Design a protein with these regions (language model features):
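Short, compositionally biased leader-like segments
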Residues: 1-6, 89-93
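Conserved beta-strand hairpin/beta-sheet module of binuclear metal-dependent hydrolase folds
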Residues: 2-57
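Metallo-beta-lactamase
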Residues: 6, 94-138
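Short coil/turn segments at beta-strand junctions that form active-site/ligand-binding loops
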Residues: 37, 63-64, 128
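Short catalytic-loop micro-motif centered on adjacent basic/acidic residues
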Residues: 39-42, 67-70, 131-132
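Structured loop/turn residues at secondary-structure junctions
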Residues: 44, 73, 135-137
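Active-site metal-binding motif and surrounding structural segment of the metallo-beta-lactamase
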Residues: 48-94
């Protein structure tokens, strides 16, 4: 199975998985929005970060990545953050303040590279505006 596939010309999916003892693996998906300011939505689990970064690099030069949106602080969405940040020096991390606090206890978050967003806000990423919502369970 390929590590990446496209669902539109400007949207790619990066597959990863989280080991679940006694069950197998939890499939996890991250999304790369290609455009004038490319956006990575979530960074995978952190298990197999090298493979995740290699999959990302098969789609884009990480130096061209401008935004890394972390949907929430759970490890299956944020585990690969540090690995991606090392390879994407121009990318800003998009988080809410609660996720920033939670992730700061387990990750080194470069605060000068953080952009905070709140539910209901939009983020202009060049050729589109991303809107942020708080899901009912978070």
């Amino acid at each position: 199975m390929d590590a990446t596939f496209r669902i539109r010309p400007d949207v790619a999916v990066i597959r990863s998985s989280e080991p679940v003892p006694g069950v197998g693996f939890l499939p996890v998906r991250s999304f790369l929005l290609l455009g004038s300011e490319p956006v990575l939505l979530d960074t995978g689990t952190g298990h197999g970060s090298d493979a995740f970064v290699a999959a990302l690099e098969s789609l884009i030069d990480p130096h061209d990545l401008r935004w890394i949106v972390v949907s929430h602080a759970d490890g299956d969405h944020s585990g690969g953050l540090e690995a991606v940040l090392r390879r994407a020096p121009k990318a800003r991390v998009v988080l809410n303040q609660v996720s920033t606090g939670k992730l700061s206890s387990t990750h080194t978050i470069p605060m000068p590279r953080v952009t905070w967003v709140n539910a209901g806000e939009g983020l202009d990423v060049g050729d589109r505006v991303l809107r942020f919502f708080r899901p009912p369970m978070y």
